[in-house]
């Protein structure tokens, strides 16, 4: 990292201002050559984290009046000397300033290169770096809060505890291998089992929250299914707050999947409205119904809509039988019933009680609060939704931790079965390697390139 990089940190296009970020060993020299401050004495003080107004020049020609932020190494975002040039928001002006900096020795930054330098300079670990991308992409308060907790290092702290435990376990084993004649604790297999069990407990605790974390980060794939004309499209429109799907009394109106995103109780749902389930001779409708069944196979949540006062159809019973734990049954059109039937007593009409059943009416706005409560219950797995407990949410990190758990479990089995300690150490070392991959302490350059390529150019 002996070169200096520059990139536009704001979105391409016209606006009130553009921000150019410059970082590297030549950053100060480039700015000194191109920037004429309005207050030279204050500029010469070289105070850190300060803003300075002045002219940015290309030789004798003034390009713009700019505001420059100075952040000196090692206290900057990248750990290098960083200057942020705030210019007027025309893209032409920003490009002129960028070209001048490149002419003075900088080069255009690659995608994510500023954050990659921050990682390589020890300003943040890989989990914190990936959380920055998640924060930028966040679509709900919950996903933003999750990313912020990871950026603050709260998740990294828990992983560091796990890593320390596994490192101590490995040292414990290696002491037993190196000094087999000593009557020390390292020869005690029960003590070793306890150490491995502690590591497994810490790792599994992290994994337990990963489903919640992943849903908060990516959303929950939710499929709306049911017979024709039970209110599937009406529910989609109600959740969206707009007429997204066509609603008619004609069966088979929805023939293809309609996909939309909606936030309920701070949780992002990736909604799929499907074709009504029935026997049909229409080729196009039959294809839509086949897609409905395939969508259910991938769904994390199935909203099965049935019509109040009607017996369950074969397709509905099949869904309840096959996808019991994933189903919430919405007994829709409660507004069409009279008397006691409009209350909880309606549940008595359905002897099959797989899944969760909610009396519902899109027309009268009945059942939406209970639906939101049930969705939260499933996502947070009964825990308080406002918890600040850091959660795993990144599939790369989750996969690495799953491999670490597998390696620790293999090590535990090896000890229990009386295998030599050098054999046990192979599994424990593998677990340590996987945990180090999570934080970036031990990671291949190709993986780093892949991770940081997902960032925008100016980040």
Swiss-Prot record:
Among SUPFAM superfamilies, the record links this protein to: P-loop containing nucleoside triphosphate hydrolases (SSF52540), TrmE connector domain (SSF116878)
Q: Which Gene3D superfamilies does the annotation name? A: P-loop containing nucleotide triphosphate hydrolases, Probable tRNA modification gtpase trme, domain 1, tRNA modification GTPase MnmE domain 2
Q: Which residues does GTP bind?
A: 229-234, 248-254, 273-276
What is the uppermost EC class here? hydrolase
Where is this chain's protein located in or outside the cell? Answer: Cytoplasm
Question: A GO molecular-function term, please?
Answer: GTPase activity
Cofactor note, please? Binds 1 potassium ion per subunit.
InterPro entries linked:
G_TrmE, GTP-bd, GTP-bd_TrmE_N, GTPase_MnmE, MnmE_dom2, MnmE_helical, P-loop_NTPase, Small_GTP-bd
Q: Under which EC number(s) is this enzyme classified?
A: 3.6.-.-
What keywords is this UniProt entry annotated with? Cytoplasm, GTP-binding, Hydrolase, Magnesium, Metal-binding, Nucleotide-binding, Potassium, tRNA processing
Ranges where the TrmE-type G domain occurs: 219-380
Q: Where does K(+) bind?
A: 229, 248, 250, 253
Q: Which cofactors, by name? A: K(+)
**Residues noted as binding Mg(2+) in the record, renumbered to the chain:** 233, 254
Q: Name one GO cellular component term.
A: cytosol
Q: Which Pfam families match?
A: MMR_HSR1, MnmE_helical, TrmE_N
Q: Which GO terms describe its biological process?
A: tRNA methylation; tRNA wobble uridine modification
Role description: Exhibits a very high intrinsic GTPase hydrolysis rate. Involved in the addition of a carboxymethylaminomethyl (cmnm) group at the wobble position (U34) of certain tRNAs, forming tRNA-cmnm(5)s(2)U34.
Q: So what family is this one in?
A: Belongs to the TRAFAC class TrmE-Era-EngA-EngB-Septin-like GTPase superfamily. TrmE GTPase family.
Q: How does it assemble?
A: Homodimer. Heterotetramer of two MnmE and two MnmG subunits.
Q: In its UniProt entry, what is this protein called?
A: tRNA modification GTPase MnmE
According to its UniProt entry, this protein's organism is Desulfitobacterium hafniense (strain Y51)
Lineage of the native species? Bacteria, Bacillati, Bacillota, Clostridia, Eubacteriales
Give the gene name.
mnmE
């Amino acid at each position: 990292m002996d070169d200096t990089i520059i990139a536009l940190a704001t979105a391409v296009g016209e606006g009130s201002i553009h921000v150019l970020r410059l970082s590297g060993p030549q950053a100060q020299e480039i700015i000194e050559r191109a920037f004429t401050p309005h207050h030279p004495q204050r500029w010469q003080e070289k105070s850190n984290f300060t803003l300075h107004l002045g002219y940015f020049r290309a030789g004798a020609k003034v390009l713009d009046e700019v505001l420059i932020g100075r952040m000196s190494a090692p206290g900057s975002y990248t750990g290098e000397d960083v200057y942020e040039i705030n210019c007027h928001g025309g893209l032409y002006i920003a490009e002129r300033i960028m070209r001048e900096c490149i002419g003075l020795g900088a080069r255009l930054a690659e995608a994510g290169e500023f954050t990659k330098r921050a990682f390589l300079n020890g300003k943040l670990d890989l989990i914190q770096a990936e959380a920055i991308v998640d924060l930028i992409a966040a679509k709900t308060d919950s996903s933003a809060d999750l990313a912020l907790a990871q950026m603050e290092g709260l998740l990294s702290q828990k992983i560091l505890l796990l890593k320390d435990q596994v490192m101590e376990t490995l040292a414990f084993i290696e002491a037993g291998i190196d000094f087999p004649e000593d009557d020390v604790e390292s020869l005690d297999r029960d003590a070793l089992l306890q150490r491995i069990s502690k590591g497994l407990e810490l790792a599994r605790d992290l994994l337990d929250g990963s489903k919640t974390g992943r849903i908060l980060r990516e959303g929950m794939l939710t499929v709306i299914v049911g017979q024709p004309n039970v209110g599937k499209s009406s529910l989609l429109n109600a959740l969206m707050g707009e007429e997204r799907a066509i609603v008619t009394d004609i069966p088979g109106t929805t023939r293809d999947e309609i996909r939309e995103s909606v936030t309920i109780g701070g949780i992002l749902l990736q909604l799929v409205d499907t074709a009504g389930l029935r026997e049909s001779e229409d080729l196009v409708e039959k294809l839509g119904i086949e897609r409905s069944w395939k969508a259910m196979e991938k769904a994390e949540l199935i909203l099965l809509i049935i019509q109040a006062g009607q017996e369950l159809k074969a397709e509905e019973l099949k869904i309840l039988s096959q996808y019991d734990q994933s189903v919430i049954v919405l007994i829709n059109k409660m507004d069409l019933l009279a008397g006691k039937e409009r209350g909880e007593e309606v549940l008595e009409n359905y002897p099959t009680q797989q899944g969760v059943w909610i009396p519902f009416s899109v027309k009268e706005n009945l059942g939406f609060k209970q639906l939101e409560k049930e969705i939260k219950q499933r996502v947070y797995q009964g825990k308080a939704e406002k918890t600040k407990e850091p959660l795993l949410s990144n599939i790369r990190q989750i996969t690495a931790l799953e491999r670490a758990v597998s390696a620790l479990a293999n090590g535990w089995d090896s000890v229990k079965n009386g295998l030599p300690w050098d054999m046990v150490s192979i599994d424990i070392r593998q677990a340590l390697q996987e945990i180090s991959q999570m934080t970036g302490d031990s990671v291949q350059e190709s993986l780093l390139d892949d991770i940081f390529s997902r960032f925008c150019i100016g980040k």
